[in-house]
């Protein structure tokens, strides 16, 4: 029986006898093969579906470690800045650990599903007029001056927890893929995966992938090599103009002979709809930067035909239902409450 990441991977994690056995049974997420897209693209494409984690995103992996260590160190309050998923994970694990959680969010820039989670888990929520980068700056300053644990990805325990996804990919495939494609926002996750692949390879000889990270064009600070003061993208989860793990992400790409690239909002939305309608996988828009990047780089030849590719889908599609409804051409059809009318419509729709 799966007992969570701290139990499963304790030999790889900085835990002690005093570390609480905190868990919501995070991790152990499916690696789903996409046969139709694999055939279309001429590659072997799989998706690591992190949206099935307890709060619906990959953030649970790092948060269980960050909160457990904060508890071990005697803190009773945690704090974070968030575009949504971090706040949901922080609030959930704080509730589980009987701790207080304070989150700062950019006002009006957080997907509804994520805000609802933070509210239900009991977080203290502060909205500011600035963006995520402004929020993180404030949180870091407050945590330096107060006995409050910072649980954003600048917290090294977050990276430790998140690296476990790379272990799972290797276990599920039997080896590392040729390419690991991943969205890049605050850049902690690409950093964590690369750390995980290196550690697992050192112990088990599973090989190392090329790390290919994808920023949204309107928030592509690393690609442009400049801080973006007012980042804008449909992909709210990666709407970050000054990534906290910038240097480490660049290092991960360089060490692995990979690349940090950018994709447009149109490319993200195309990928978002494509994997849902062709493969039955529903991920939030920010997640789909990885798929958009794979499509782009297969077309350019940067990802060779025949490659074994894992694209990380970082969050569940239900995190951002408004985007799904807003962009869909498929709208409910209103008909009379009459079987004959409905049958006639169904015959036309089904072409029977």
Curated annotation (Swiss-Prot):
<dbReference type="GO" id="GO:0005737">
    <property type="term" value="C:cytoplasm"/>
</dbReference>
<keyword id="KW-0663">Pyridoxal phosphate</keyword>
<dbReference type="GO" id="GO:0030170">
    <property type="term" value="F:pyridoxal phosphate binding"/>
</dbReference>
<feature type="binding site">
    <location>
        <position position="314"/>
    </location>
    <ligand>
        <name>pyridoxal 5'-phosphate</name>
    </ligand>
</feature>
<dbReference type="GO" id="GO:0019344">
    <property type="term" value="P:cysteine biosynthetic process"/>
</dbReference>
<comment type="similarity">
    <text>Belongs to the threonine synthase family.</text>
</comment>
<dbReference type="InterPro" id="IPR026260">
    <property type="entry name" value="Thr_Synthase_bac/arc"/>
</dbReference>
<feature type="modified residue" description="N6-(pyridoxal phosphate)lysine">
    <location>
        <position position="59"/>
    </location>
</feature>
<dbReference type="Pfam" id="PF00291">
    <property type="entry name" value="PALP"/>
</dbReference>
<feature type="binding site">
    <location>
        <begin position="185"/>
        <end position="189"/>
    </location>
    <ligand>
        <name>pyridoxal 5'-phosphate</name>
    </ligand>
</feature>
<dbReference type="InterPro" id="IPR036052">
    <property type="entry name" value="TrpB-like_PALP_sf"/>
</dbReference>
<keyword id="KW-0791">Threonine biosynthesis</keyword>
<feature type="binding site">
    <location>
        <position position="85"/>
    </location>
    <ligand>
        <name>pyridoxal 5'-phosphate</name>
    </ligand>
</feature>
<dbReference type="GO" id="GO:0004795">
    <property type="term" value="F:threonine synthase activity"/>
</dbReference>
<dbReference type="InterPro" id="IPR000634">
    <property type="entry name" value="Ser/Thr_deHydtase_PyrdxlP-BS"/>
</dbReference>
<keyword id="KW-0456">Lyase</keyword>
<dbReference type="InterPro" id="IPR001926">
    <property type="entry name" value="TrpB-like_PALP"/>
</dbReference>
<comment type="function">
    <text>Catalyzes the gamma-elimination of phosphate from L-phosphohomoserine and the beta-addition of water to produce L-threonine.</text>
</comment>
<dbReference type="InterPro" id="IPR004450">
    <property type="entry name" value="Thr_synthase-like"/>
</dbReference>
<protein>
    <recommendedName>
        <fullName>Threonine synthase</fullName>
        <ecNumber>4.2.3.1</ecNumber>
    </recommendedName>
</protein>
<dbReference type="InterPro" id="IPR050147">
    <property type="entry name" value="Ser/Thr_Dehydratase"/>
</dbReference>
<comment type="pathway">
    <text>Amino-acid biosynthesis; L-threonine biosynthesis; L-threonine from L-aspartate: step 5/5.</text>
</comment>
<dbReference type="GO" id="GO:0009088">
    <property type="term" value="P:threonine biosynthetic process"/>
</dbReference>
<keyword id="KW-0028">Amino-acid biosynthesis</keyword>
């Amino acid at each position: 029986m799966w007992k969570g990441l701290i139990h499963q991977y304790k030999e790889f994690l900085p835990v002690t006898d005093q570390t609480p056995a905190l868990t919501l049974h995070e991790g152990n997420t499916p690696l789903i093969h996409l046969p139709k897209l694999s055939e279309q693209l001429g590659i072997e494409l799989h998706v690591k579906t992190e949206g099935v984690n307890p709060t619906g995103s990959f953030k649970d992996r790092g948060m269980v470690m960050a909160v457990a260590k904060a508890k071990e160190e005697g803190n009773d309050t945690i704090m974070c800045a968030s575009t949504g998923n971090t706040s949901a994970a922080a609030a959930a694990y704080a509730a589980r650990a009987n701790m207080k959680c304070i989150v700062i969010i950019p006002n009006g820039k957080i997907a509804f599903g994520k805000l609802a989670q933070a509210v239900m888990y009991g977080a203290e929520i502060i909205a500011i007029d600035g963006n995520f980068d402004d929020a993180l700056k404030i949180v870091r300053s407050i945590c330096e001056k107060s006995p409050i644990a910072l649980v954003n990805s600048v917290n090294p325990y977050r990276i430790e927890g998140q690296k476990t996804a790379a272990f799972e990919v290797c276990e599920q495939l039997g080896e590392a893929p040729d390419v690991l494609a991943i969205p890049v926002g605050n850049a902690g996750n690409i950093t964590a995966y690369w750390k995980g692949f290196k550690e697992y390879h050192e112990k088990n000889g599973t090989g190392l992938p090329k790390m290919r990270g994808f920023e949204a064009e309107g928030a592509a600070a690393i690609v442009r090599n400049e801080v973006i003061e007012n980042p804008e993208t449909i992909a709210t989860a990666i709407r970050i103009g000054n990534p906290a793990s910038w240097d480490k992400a660049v290092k991960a790409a360089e060490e692995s002979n990979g690349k940090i690239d950018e994709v447009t909002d149109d490319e993200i939305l195309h990928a978002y709809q494509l994997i849902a309608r062709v493969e039955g996988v529903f991920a939030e828009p920010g997640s789909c930067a990885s798929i958009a990047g794979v499509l782009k780089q297969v077309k350019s030849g940067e990802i060779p035909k025949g490659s074994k590719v894992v694209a990380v889908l970082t969050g569940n599609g239900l995190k951002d239902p408004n985007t799904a409804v807003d962009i869909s051409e498929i709208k409910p059809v209103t008909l009379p409450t009459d079987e004959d009318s409905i049958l006639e419509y169904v015959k036309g729709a089904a072409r029977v």
